[in-house]
């Protein structure tokens, strides 16, 4: 009988040992250690055991790294290749050997569409809407889990739309304007809360043809095309406290003539009308001031902007990428000193760039 009890205890002890994340360590201490492994090695961690894979794909892992300030930001770029198919690449901006790498293949149904948007909320990147030559605007949404490196179907939009703008504010995705089906409201916008789903709204100040957007000071700004008659830039701003869209500051809107990005509360715009020149909006004096020009040898317009911390990344055709620190930006003979990242061998057009932090 004692022998059976001893064997049972040994089996129980073995099960506990097998279940431990790291043999001989309590799980909380194991998580403390594993969470400090740089993000670029997380794919390797998943191969060690099923428990490690489950951990590194879990909300617990995501929340722990975020709370301990261990999370790292990577840049994701949605591109379109020569065959008019969508593809997506990722860049680790802190890697000593920075280069763009393809991520898990996009869902087949979305690869040939046009007018799709991407947005990031938490550890997920969403691929929204779109249309085709023989396909009306769709409400389909696909969700990419950056921890699991896998795509799944997401909650569909309230309104089918394509060629629209997306932003995140107060932990919600805003899908604004664009073209929809014949029955859809051209002045509509949708909000997505993961706990509630999509809710549709309407405002007469929303117009379908949106070219750019950004979030600054807790407000969403959208810009439409420049009028060929008046050269006037139509821009509106959303105030979440009132739920109303109203016309944006005319002086600010007048200089918003290219892709925009906000870093540390400051708005920057890339003027691509003659070369590539970075402009900065001075809130206090309400004027646009030039930061400097970028070397034409490094940039390949049309470009997109994305910011990580105080560094701005200018991403152009073929994912040619220029990185500059706005606090340390230096001009030499009118050209900004910057570092660059090798482009791909292809000439893919960059549709949008977003940051995802894990």
What role is predicted for each listed range?
Residues 80-105, 136-137:
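Beta-propeller domains
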